[in-house]
Amino acid sequence: MSDGSVERGTKRAEDSLATHQLTVQYKRYYIDVNENTRGRYIKIAELGTNYKSRIILSIVAAKAIVSEISKMLALIDEPSTGEHAPKESSLIKSETLNVDGRKFYVDLKENVRGRFLRIAQMPMNPRQTRQQIAIPSDGIAEIHKVLTEYLAKFGEGHEQENTNTPKITAENKSFLFHSGKNDRGEFVRISEIKLNSGYRNAITVPMSALVDFRKELDNIIANQGK
């Protein structure tokens, strides 16, 4: 297994903050941390022979999945319970997560080639197909390690929702207000979520502009109906 990691910061509509590559058996995996107007997210891509699969995770979804993988690490190297390796895939442990209005399956499975981890992301639109990746046992610990490191470095202040997040609901939309801090300074992120589709958008307001931001909103409210 080989790997490489490089951090980079490009100033475009979408910023690439870090990427990690590793090769497991005949597959290549890329773990990318990106940021756009909706916030930060992690993309995990699997490249095999003539195919490519990927899943895209919000920071909060990535944290939930890493937590479940942590519980499965001890099972990776356990011997098979049967006398022979299974001819078809058998399920060892499975968890279902509901995060950001989406359902995720984290499954530790086994077949004739050995144990592997499958992470499946269900689509918001039922007419679309689900996205999933499969990681052989040789690469599970490495990917878990990289995800844990990236969440520690890039995840703070970018959790999109928790029980203490101020929330306003109006006209089939929810608005979340999250204050945080990163290497660029303090900020407030305002997320807009459409309740019927789960579509999410966000803006980030620097703390230094927050007073002026409030003044403009006060002016708009004061002039309503005039």
From Swiss-Prot:
PANTHER family named in the record: PUR-TRANSCRIPTIONAL ACTIVATOR, PURINE-RICH BINDING PROTEIN-ALPHA, ISOFORM B
Regions that span the bilayer: none
The protein's name: Transcriptional activator plp-1
UniProt GO cellular component terms: chromosome; nucleus; P granule
InterPro entries for this protein: PUR-bd_fam
Domain of life the protein comes from: Eukaryota
Function: Probable transcription activator. Binds telomeric DNA containing repeats of the sequence, 5'-TTAGGC-3'. Binds to end-1 promoter, activating end-1 expression, which is required for endoderm specification during embryonic development.
Coiled coil: none
Subcellular location: Nucleus; Chromosome
GO biological process: germ cell development; regulation of locomotion; regulation of transcription by RNA polymerase II
